[in-house]
Amino acid sequence: MKDYIKLNEDRWNHVNNDYTEPLTHEEVEEVRKNPISVALTVGKKVPIEWFEKANGKKILGLACGGGQQGSAFAIKGYDVTIMDFSASQLQRDEMVAEREGLKINTIQADMTKPFPFEDETFDIIFNPVSNVYIEDLENMYREAARVLKRVEC
């Protein structure tokens, strides 16, 4: 049953479309000048109110490789870690970070398995539409809850 995970990983390692195009230098400069603008899914930008002032907040880009959202978060001052199972997607993040002088941690890992982080590591998890590619959402969300810092409401 887990063969679909390997097939999906192989596909993302070889796909070349808008979801895998890293930010250009010109796009990075636009991000530097404007409020943060990222999408969780095609055509739907995240409301800017969802983002607090960065102040070094730790953000996990879960299945978020590709050199787009992670770069935008790093530009805006977040402490960024990207976790993705696609080596080629992570290479795009590393390429943009190196080219633009950004700090982005990349971790190659499978979101269907225990996350390689301590409890309460991150302030925010940004997970663009990727949960549709896995069978066991409960485990993924359990792991996400485990690595998120607790806050008082």
PLM features: what roles do these ranges have?
Residues 57, 121, 151-152:
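Surface-exposed loop/turn positions
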Residues 54-114:
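Class I SAM-dependent methyltransferase SAM/SAH-binding core
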Residues 24-57:
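Conserved alpha-helix/loop element of class I SAM-dependent methyltransferases that forms part
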Residues 112-125:
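A short acidic, Gly/Pro-enriched loop at the edge of an enzyme's catalytic core
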